Amino acid sequence: MKSITVTQSAVQKCAQLLERANSVGVLTGAGISTSAGIPDFRGPQGLYVTRRYDPDTIFDINYFYANPAPFYEFAHDFIGLEATIEPTFAHRFLAHLEMIGKIKGIVTQNIDSLHQMAGSQNVLEMHGSFWRSFCLVCAQEYSFEIMKHKLAQENVVHCPCGGVIKPDIVFFGENVKFMDEAIHLAEKTDLFLVIGTSCVVYPAALVPTYASGDIVIINKSLVDLPRGNVVLQAQEDIDEFFKNIAALLQVKISDN
C-alpha cells in the first residue's frame, strides 16, 4: 500500500486548536466516507458515473411519486454497500471527541449513518438516511433491517397497505432537515470543523458561514469559503490527517 504523508504543521495547528477549544461543531460530507467504501456520488468513481444514475431523476421527489423504480435501482446498490461497510478512523475519532465532551454536535450531509455506527450521539442528518423508512400512504415506519429484507424480495418496496415505502432521505423538492439546529451549533461553538465536503450543495454549504469561532477545513480538494474566520485549510487525506492528530494528542482509537 502506498504510504500517505500529511503536512505536520497543519496537524500541529489543528491539534492545538482542538486542545484549546471548549466546544467544537462539525460539518461532514461524502469525503469522510469514501475510505469506508462508499464512492463520492459525483466523483470520477461515484455511483452516478459508474452506474449511470441521473441524480436529477432518482432524487426528484415528484419523479419518485410518479415512478419510484429508478430510485430503487440505486437503493439496491447503496443498501448493499451500507450492509458491508464500517466507520472510518475519522468517524471514530470524532466519536471519541464527542465522548470526552469536546464535540457538541455533528452536522452531516451523508445518508450512510456511519457517524452513529461509530458511536456519535448528537448527529444532525440534513439529508436524512436509510436508517428508517415510511409508507407514503399509512406512514408505517420500517427499520433498516426490514428494508434490507424487503429489498431482497421486491424491486420497488411496498407496505402491506399497498403504499410505496420511501426511505427517510431528503429528495430534491423537499426541505433539508435540522437547518435551524445546524446554524445554532455553528453559532454557539468556538471551533468549527468542515470535513470532506466541498461546500457546493446548498443549503448545507451555508452552515459554516454562521460559525462564530475559528473554522478548520480538512478536504482533499480546495474549499471555497469566505476567508473570514477560516484559520486552517488542510488539503489532506482525512483518515491520515486525524491519525496524525490522534498520535500527537496521545489518543488511542480502537480498530474496527
For each predicted feature, which ranges?
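Conserved catalytic core of sirtuin-type NAD+-dependent deacylases
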Residues: M1-N256
